């Protein structure tokens, strides 16, 4: 091996151009001049150096260049996408898995090109460009670029020119690092004596890398909220996990004939589901952020009643507890279960339906009500891009959508718009409706969103646990108390109107509180739980209230996927075919979620795959119908899942 240093006029010209370009870009991106000078020195050295390496060790030099490239690619992408605080959150193990994944990409390209220089150049530029795409997509809409976005790339490109993007100094640093890496690659001549041997080795190493990635990512979930995917899983791995979770396997026994056989039982409207005295009430649905009754986890004492008004509701009220499929986060899955009647029980753990599986117009309570003449309205006092609601709501069939800019942003508690402000907006929209307008409003609150550890000058904690100091729990309980006051104002208003009104209320999930507090309640915390104890962490309160006469009822346990069916029943609206199926399913399987189901036969919670007999039959039918509605566009049942008219 020999190293020679030779300065030429041509190299100096190239160096001057590169240095000036770096300085100009650095000026406009506020990059450190020390970084620019370091690049200039390294570039000057690389452009003038000549390396002669032993041909017999070509495989070693190729391996070194590929490994350096994989490490640099992963580091650069993470560095560009994450803040300094989030950058250090990624574990060493996740970093290694991402680097092995990147190495697999390099090896695949090497297999195709049989050229180390070309491979390293293509792979490093491609992976870095991939990271840049995610950066711009995040700036554009507030969540990351995923595999699902490839299906709607045309829509994104059609509006991207309307947005202004800012490039910061991190871009410059990783681009300069990539330039130096490519310069290094170009200075090293690597030739293989046998292209066939090289390709065999490349494919074998690729298989080893892929197996390593699979074995070390089987327990990982796709993360789609903001940039959690990048710092928890690494961006490259998170994207691949999104591909994995996008392909949901058809259930055993699935076929068009199987769907038709199930649907055939609900072809004619059963008289028990047909309402002759339909009131067509105004229907208001409130999904309240993190609203839960923690006493279902374990008993504890507070200085005052947390939700006195909601606890007092009984007249014209159906109330009880429902199983959510999420705990502490991933709100839109609860929203989706309510709207469609489908269940997370049959989807991959960690998936988020709004961002992974909605690409057409799913049948929902929204579309069904719209088809019978309702005006459908969605309200959420937060950003439209949150969980891609701005893209999903039109698919669901909402006529009107209201987001954070449509609310009075001075009406905040802690950092979020209050429940009361949302309810005032709902009342305002109700008062503007025409006399013959049938109205459906879905309101998703933000007031109680976690975390609960900071103190705020605009919020007084009035409720606290007696005995022990749990700052986050006390703040959370105080927020529930504020929600209860706002709820009382909402119900009081609609008690006084002449038109029939139905209000549906439920929590999306329990809050993410410190494990010590949960351990105080159930004696175990969040681990080592029985199926019953685990399901207690997924219970949320719900009620359906009307300002007209309906039976007072209590429900021990149901699940969010059934609430839209109960909503239509209490509104005296004829049930569509799928809701008739759900009504019968509810009799056999009272509650089902991502963790399991309640077995009437065994009088306990069980895993779905433990079901036997009639229960297994109904769960299988449910799975078949849900798969048909979500993934079989060609043979989607028009009876069970009609499109918007």
Give short role names for the model-derived ranges.
Residues 132, 159, 187, 242, ...:
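Residues that form generic nucleotide/phosphate-binding pockets
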Residues 270-278, 285-288, 293-645:
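Solvent-exposed soluble domains appended to multi-pass membrane proteins
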Residues 150-153, 233-236, 240, 307, ...:
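Alpha-helix initiation and N-capping motif
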Residues 215-285:
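Membrane-interface segments at or immediately adjacent to transmembrane helices
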